[in-house]
């Protein structure tokens, strides 16, 4: 199958590498013309994922029309902020009918829409829209280390066709029709990873980390259920699986944000040092607004938002959570 990957960050590049190494032709495209030239010349993404050479089956395209030609699937792997404009480009290039998966995680700022909802709004006639989510770091996938992720869509027939087409010995795929649950799990776990990074950076120990992960899962489940998701989805790869990896893994950008804030650094300084997008930071406010809309109590999210707004110190965040009134779990 010909696959088009839009977005050449670390995750987009890792997915392009993976699928091109497992029987697919892949075209990789990004808006950044300088990055396109660099990748074409070096046959490697030295900016986003250095150290991994591109196989012959991976084509880097300067023209989106070339990238979309004969494509059977589009993966949009931009930041959430770039998702809508990428979907609009598909329409502009006459490719709005192509099957499309959002492989980014978060809520769109200002609208509060989940990734698949953005795609549905921009491409209302497209019946093959979904998300790819689950516990997976770009570096490990590029090294062909095993992982398992979820493909979710409201279109069950399409997912049943797509899963065996994309399933490999490196990336095991599971299908789901609970696209809300899969999308919410992927979005909100980034917020919880900032909290665990904060706790780890303050050296509060493994007990505190376990408590934050567990209560974070409770917050995610409450919100997802209120939005129409199946609670059992939160017990799977797109829920607790992604949460554990992002909250504990050394490669987690969002956890690194928490670690940096615990050191007393300004948020903008932390983000510059990381050098990549942290969806957790841009998602916090929309998660909190959505929780308010559904009248869901999300204390971890709320206190983190106060931290980002400089209304609390890192120490006060943890203290506030521990001082909450006693209650039954």
Swiss-Prot record:
It holds the Pfam family NAD_Gly3P_dh_C. One of its GO terms (biological process) is glycerol-3-phosphate metabolic process. InterPro entries: 6-PGluconate_DH-like_C_sf (IPR008927), 6PGD_dom2 (IPR013328), G3P_DH_NAD-dep (IPR006168), G3P_DH_NAD-dep_C (IPR006109), G3P_DH_NAD-dep_N (IPR011128), NAD(P)-bd_dom_sf (IPR036291). Sn-glycerol 3-phosphate binds at residues 105, 134, 136, 189, 242, 252-254. Pathway: Membrane lipid metabolism; glycerophospholipid metabolism. Its EC number is 1.1.1.94. NADPH binds at residues 10-11, 31, 105, 138, 253, 277, 279. GO terms for molecular function: glycerol-3-phosphate dehydrogenase [NAD(P)+] activity; NAD binding. It catalyses: sn-glycerol 3-phosphate + NAD(+) = dihydroxyacetone phosphate + NADH + H(+); sn-glycerol 3-phosphate + NADP(+) = dihydroxyacetone phosphate + NADPH + H(+). One of its GO terms (cellular component) is cytosol. It is found in: Cytoplasm. Keywords: Cytoplasm, Lipid biosynthesis, Lipid metabolism, NAD, NADP, Nucleotide-binding, Oxidoreductase, Phospholipid biosynthesis, Phospholipid metabolism. The keyword Glycoprotein does not apply. PROSITE patterns: NAD_G3PDH. NCBIfam families: PRK00094.1-2, PRK00094.1-4. Catalyzes the reduction of the glycolytic intermediate dihydroxyacetone phosphate (DHAP) to sn-glycerol 3-phosphate (G3P), the key precursor for phospholipid synthesis. Belongs to the NAD-dependent glycerol-3-phosphate dehydrogenase family. This is Glycerol-3-phosphate dehydrogenase [NAD(P)+].
């Amino acid at each position: 199958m010909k696959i088009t990957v839009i977005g050449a960050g670390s995750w987009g590049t890792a997915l392009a590498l993976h699928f091109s190494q497992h029987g697919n032709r892949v075209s990789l495209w990004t808006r950044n013309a300088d990055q396109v030239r660099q990748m074409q010349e070096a046959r490697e993404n030295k900016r986003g994922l250095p150290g991994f050479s591109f196989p012959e089956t991976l084509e880097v395209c300067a023209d989106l029309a070339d990238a979309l030609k004969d494509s059977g699937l589009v993966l949009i792997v931009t930041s959430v902020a770039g998702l809508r404009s990428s979907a609009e480009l598909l329409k502009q290039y006459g490719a709005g009918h192509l099957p499309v998966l959002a492989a980014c995680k978060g809520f769109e700022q200002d609208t509060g829409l989940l990734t698949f909802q953005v795609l549905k709004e921009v491409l209302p006639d497209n019946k093959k829209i979904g998300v790819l989510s689950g516990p997976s770091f770009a570096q490990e996938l590029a090294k062909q280390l095993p992982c398992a992720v979820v493909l979710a869509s409201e279109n069950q027939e399409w997912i049943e066709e797509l899963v065996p087409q994309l399933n490999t010995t490196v990336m095991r795929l599971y299908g789901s029709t609970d696209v809300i649950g899969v999308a919410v799990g992927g979005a909100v776990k980034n917020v919880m990873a900032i909290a665990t990074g904060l706790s780890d950076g303050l050296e509060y120990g493994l007990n505190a980390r376990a408590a934050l992960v567990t209560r974070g899962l409770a917050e995610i489940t409450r919100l997802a259920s209120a939005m129409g998701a199946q609670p059992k989805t939160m017990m799977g790869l797109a829920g607790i699986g992604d949460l554990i990896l992002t909250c504990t893994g050394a490669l987690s950008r969002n956890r690194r944000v928490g670690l940096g804030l615990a050191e007393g650094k300004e948020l903008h300084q932390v983000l510059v040092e990381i050098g990549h997008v942290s969806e957790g930071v841009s998602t916090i406010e929309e998660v909190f607004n959505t929780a308010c809309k559904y009248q869901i109590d999300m204390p971890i999210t709320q206190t983190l938002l106060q931290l980002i707004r400089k209304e609390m110190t890192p120490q006060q965040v943890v203290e506030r959570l521990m001082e909450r009134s006693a209650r039954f779990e």
